Each structure stands twice: as C-alpha cells, then as structure tokens.
Amino acid sequence: MTEKSTDVYLGMGAIVHEGGVAFRVWAPHADAVFVKGTFNNWSESADPMKAEEHGTWYTDIPHAKVGDEYKFVLSNGNQKLERMDPYARQVTNSAGNCVIYDPKVFDWEGDRFELPPFNELAIYEMHIGSFFADSDKKPGDFDSAAEKMDHLKRLGVNAIQV
C-alpha cells in the first residue's frame, strides 16, 4: 500500500491507493489549483486542491481510478493555465493528457537484458513525440516509433534513450 500520513498520501503526481487516487503538484505561485479528468467529466471546478506547505497542492479523489486521464488547472490572478502533471508516469502523447498509472502492476521479473559493452554502445536519444508522426497535426507515439526500430537497428543503434 502507498505510504500514508494522517489521512494524506505521500508523494507527488497521481498517487494510487486502495480508496482512490490522491494528487499532489508543486505550484508555488498559484492562487488555486484543480484536477480535471475523465473521473469528473473534465470539470475545471469539481475537484479543488488544498494548498500545503512549500508550494504544493493536494487532493484525494475516491472516484478516480487507474486508466483515467487528467490535467491540472492552475489559477494565478486573471490567468487560468491547463498543465500536464510533471510526475505523470503515463501520457496519451506529449501534448495530450496524463493517465493515472499504478507502478505496482508492472512485471519487473523474467526479462533477460544484457547491456552491450560500454565501448560498443551506439545510443540514440529519442523524443517520442517528434521522432516520427503519421501527420503534422499530431505528435508521434510509441507505436509509430516502434515501427521505425528496424531502421535504427540497420544504422547500428543498440541503445535508445527516451
């Protein structure tokens, strides 16, 4: 279970727990912060966050669940800003929405990976959204990048930094 301290879950971003999902974001200059997403019909006011110490904001949403999409809405004076969660573990794409993800469900066992020797590494640094896109209107995604792996392999690339 996720670590809890006096009814407040510890951590940043979307924090999955048995009773829903807690959210925490650092926004020291905001006057107000809300979470909007599929769990509240993208309402910009249904789920306000409470200011904590040191510029963080927190809320716990019992009806939010793994797989729901979300964004933060920050208010500062007359400005209203919609922002992605910098701690999101999954996103729809680099300009899209965050997705609530439970890191405890990932299978870390059974994979055999051997790193090539240091002097043989050919590392390609990749930004998924700009590596390859099917159209100019939408950023690339992991599926479109995966289609081009054979090309990178032919070039001699044996490691990718995402």
Where on the chain are the PLM-derived regions?
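The feature marks proteins involved in alpha-glucan
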Residues: 1-22, 44-47, 51-125, 130-137, ...
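Short proline/glycine-enriched turn/loop motifs at strand-loop junctions of beta-rich domains
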Residues: 26-33, 64-65
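Short beta-strand elements bearing conserved aromatic residues within extracellular beta-rich modules
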Residues: 33-35, 70
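Predominantly extracellular/luminal cell-surface or secreted proteins
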Residues: 36-38, 75
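Gly/lys/ser-thr-rich phosphate-binding loops in alpha/beta enzymes
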Residues: 40-42
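Catalytic domains of carbohydrate-active enzymes, especially glycoside hydrolases
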Residues: 147-162
